[in-house]
A protein has these predicted regions:
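Short, structured patches in soluble enzyme cores that scaffold and shape functional sites
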Residues: 91, 110, 138-140, 168, ...
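Short helix-initiation/N-cap motifs at beta->coil->alpha
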Residues: 32-44, 96, 134-166, 285-295
Length: 301
């Protein structure tokens, strides 16, 4: 009997095809992992290779690669967004200028959370606030067990929203699920954030990457045709979704398939920000991130 292919991916319009009982990959049936929210799949993937294929946050992949995890990155962006609006304060709390966050406490689910990577990069790039000048109050450990957090990272219990509501932090970084599920309107602290987001996009010629597609390296090496077929299936769905949207917002514009200029730009900025913030400590190039894909799927893709 042909072995089932295990895949961990969030339910998006462009991943709905994975739930079709008739969908197979090179003759292999697909078993979709139950991981909700999807970031619950990230630690099992990087620590124990629990899945054959997994959606993975780009910051987690950068750390996993540095730690030597045998996982390969495919040039498929499953989610992304601008993140100026992700830095928020509690309604009714004191207003604060982003430039004044140095020396203050800011909440974030984990220091290695990708939304936090982007927000810290924005603070440094646009407001002159270095990541090491802020105390980052976290509620979860890194997905990569061997990662050592900077000394200005603290841990608290509960959820980031609870920490923010209690006033233990002056602001908090919240990813899309937390923002979408918040009770009441949180207040973005970056002024004119919509305009600032579009200006960032114009300056960098990309939309920030949150999650990409990864595969166990041994599967890629042993069955490149299988991985290629799955890669093409994801690509077809992404291209169809983008083509169907005549006025795409940033979450649709962020979707990528293939090695495009926008993908390369997004990966390079993620690398730069990660090095600045000690999310990773070893320099790496975009070509090195995509080396497994290029060697094994370059001709097939």
């Amino acid at each position: 009997m042909t072995q089932t292919l295990s895949i961990a991916a969030k339910s998006y319009p462009h991943t709905a095809f994975l739930t079709d009982p008739g969908f197979t990959v090179a003759g292999r049936a697909v078993e979709l992992a139950a991981a909700d929210p999807i970031y619950k799949a990230f630690a099992p993937m990087v620590r124990e290779l629990r899945y054959d294929v997994s959606e993975l946050a780009i910051a987690t992949f950068l750390q996993a690669r540095e730690a030597g995890a045998p996982i390969a990155l495919l040039p498929v962006v499953l989610s992304g967004d601008f993140h100026h609006h992700s830095l928020t304060r509690w309604p009714g709390s004191a207003e604060i200028n982003p430039a004044d966050l140095a020396g203050r406490r800011v909440g974030v689910r984990a220091y290695s959370q990708t939304t936090g990577l982007w927000v810290r990069g924005i603070l440094h790039e646009e407001f002159g606030v270095d990541a090491k000048e802020v105390t980052w109050v976290t509620t979860e450990e890194p997905h990569v067990a061997s990662y050592v957090e900077p000394p200005n990272v603290e841990r608290m219990t509960g959820k980031v929203l609870d920490v923010l509501e209690r006033g233990d932090v002056v602001a908090a970084v919240l990813g899309p699920p937390a923002l979408d599920g918040a009770q009441g309107p949180l207040v973005p602290i970056i002024p004119n954030w919509r305009e600032a987001e579009e200006a960032w996009g114009a300056r960098h010629q990309t939309v920030p990457i949150n999650h990409m597609l990864t595969v166990r390296r041994d599967l890629l090496e042993a069955e490149p045709q299988t991985v290629s077929a799955l890669y093409q299936a994801f690509g077809a769905e992404i291209e169809a979704r983008k083509a169907a949207d005549t006025a795409p917002g940033p979450r649709v514009r962020a979707l990528r398939f293939g090695v495009t200029d926008e993908l390369v730009a997004g990966l390079q900025i993620a690398i730069d920000y990660a090095l600045q913030q000690n999310v990773i400590r070893t320099p790496v190039t975009v070509a090195e991130l995509l080396d497994d894909f290029t060697r094994h799927l370059g001709e097939l893709a």
